[in-house]
Regions:
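N-terminal "arm"/small-domain region of PLP-dependent enzymes with the aminotransferase-like
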Residues: 1-36, 41, 257-259, 385
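Hydrophobic "lid"/C-terminal helical patch
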Residues: 28, 32, 72, 398, ...
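PLP-dependent aminotransferase class I/II
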Residues: 44-48, 56-59, 132-136, 141-149, ...
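PLP-dependent aminotransferase-like
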Residues: 74, 78-178, 185
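Hydrophobic/aromatic ligand-binding patch that stacks against planar heteroaromatic rings
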Residues: 96-98, 190, 270
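Conserved active-site segment immediately N-terminal to the catalytic lysine
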Residues: 162-209, 254-258, 306-307
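Active-site PLP attachment segment
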Residues: 180, 193-243, 269
Length: 410
């Protein structure tokens, strides 16, 4: 029964289904009919449009945000003997890429009652071996990039560059994990144009999807040609092959060289077609997410749960996730609430179990006891559905049930 005394029929509300319209289906069908289904003209067009959207000169589309983040580290020449700072409260991809390139992961705890890194602890973690910091725009909310850049500027005297790009940057590189934050902005600048390198995710659950995929953008670096960066990323993504399949279609252009024994992480034109259709609808999708967030915010003000501030004068979120924290509940009570929501037909989630609690990172020597603020964020967090397939009636149903269930615990 809702607050108007009306009975609400049980609904089946998924946590984050993809928002696929006939536009996406047509783009995929057109790609299939074209005979060009691997990396080709649609991928190049998506790269151009993403660069324009993010207000940068170039972008590269690859098969995941993880690949994009790793290739950024490789472009910077980061590897064995180097250190990269990562927040302890994030998804594994933020940290695993550091492991992939052979560098040392340095976890920093989040601030108390916040999902952002503790910037004082971040500054303390910087050494002569630190080559990059990976801030995470969790839930689509930009980090405080002014503070991050101020800290790395203050530590320039410790910085020892490994390659020409690091030397040109002249300080620790900021490689933003903006997997959640495509479309967000920081002080009027699009995320994608703020950090030195920014990686986005287009996975099936993200605001804008290509089913699987991601994009990497970067700021202009004085003395470094953007075309050289783009070309190197293309080499990294396709076995080090000097020509992609599209270039080899030119008359007599069969021959190619292998410049390095590198990787295979390119995007295909089928997936890029989905992305092009999504991008054409994206401003409306962002606006709808904002509407839902505002409805949630208004409904939960009196409930006593903690929520994130997605929209301020300083930044605008992409509205990717709606995280809530129910203070003073136990892990067992949190699970009870999630189960009760599921019984009402509403799928919820938790973002995130801190990485020092995961087997892979325990095996690397990390202990959650060293990250108490991350643990405090985790134990009482529940993420509600937030996506553009939700109707107003769905949102009302979620609000009614969440309010009813949480009131049993607060």
């Amino acid at each position: 029964m809702n607050n108007r005394g009306e009975f609400m029929l049980k609904r089946n509300i998924l946590f984050s289904p993809p928002d696929i319209s006939e536009l996406e289906i047509k783009e995929v069908a057109d790609a299939l009919r074209s005979g060009w289904i691997t990396t080709g003209p649609r991928t190049k067009e998506l790269e151009r449009k993403i660069a324009k959207f993010c207000e940068v000169d170039r972008a590269v589309c690859l098969n995941s945000q993880t690949a994009c983040a790793e290739m950024a580290l490789r472009i910077l020449g980061i590897g064995e003997g180097d250190e990269v700072i990562v927040p302890s409260y994030t998804y594994t991809a933020s940290a695993s890429v550091v492991y992939h390139v052979g560098a040392k992961i340095v976890f920093v705890d989040v601030q108390k009652n916040s999902l952002e890194m503790d910037y004082e602890k971040m500054a303390e973690a910087i050494t002569e071996k630190t080559k990059a910091i990976i801030p995470v725009d969790l839930a689509g909310i930009p980090c405080d990039y002014d503070k991050i850049f101020a800290i790395v500027e203050s530590k320039k005297h410790l910085f020892k560059p490994n390659n020409e790009i690091q030397k040109a940057i002249g300080r620790i590189a900021i490689c933003a994990d903006a997997a959640h934050a495509f479309g967000a902005s920081w002080k009027g600048r699009k995320v994608g144009s703020v950090a030195d390198f920014t990686s986005f995710s287009f996975h099936a659950v993200k605001n804008l999807t290509t089913a699987e995929g991601g994009a990497l953008t970067w700021r202009n670096i004085e003395g470094i040609d953007n075309e050289d960066i783009y070309h190197q990323l293309q080499l990294f993504s396709l076995h080090g092959q000097s020509k992609d399949a599209l270039a080899k279609t030119q008359l007599g252009a069969w021959e190619y060289d292998i410049k390095g024994p590198w990787y295979k992480c390119n995007m295909t034109d089928i997936l890029a077609g989905v992305g092009l259709a999504q991008l054409s609808r994206y401003e409306g999708m962002l606006a709808r997410r904002k509407e839902i967030i505002e409805k949630y915010d208004n409904a939960f003000k009196a409930l006593g749960v903690k929520t994130l501030n997605h929209y301020t004068d300083e930044y605008q979120s992409s509205g990717h996730l709606y995280l809530t924290r129910i203070l003073n509940i136990s892990l067992e009570q949190r699970q009870e609430i999630i189960v009760k929501m599921a019984e009402a037909g509403i799928a919820c989630n938790v973002h995130y179990k801190p990485l020092p609690m995961m087997t892979a990172y325990i095996n690397l020597g990390f202990d959650i006891k060293d990250y108490p603020n991350s643990y405090e964020q985790f134990v009482n967090e529940i993420t509600l559905p937030l996506h553009t397939c939700l109707t107003d009636e769905d949102v009302d149903y979620i609000i009614e049930n969440y309010t009813r269930i949480v009131k049993e615990y607060v």
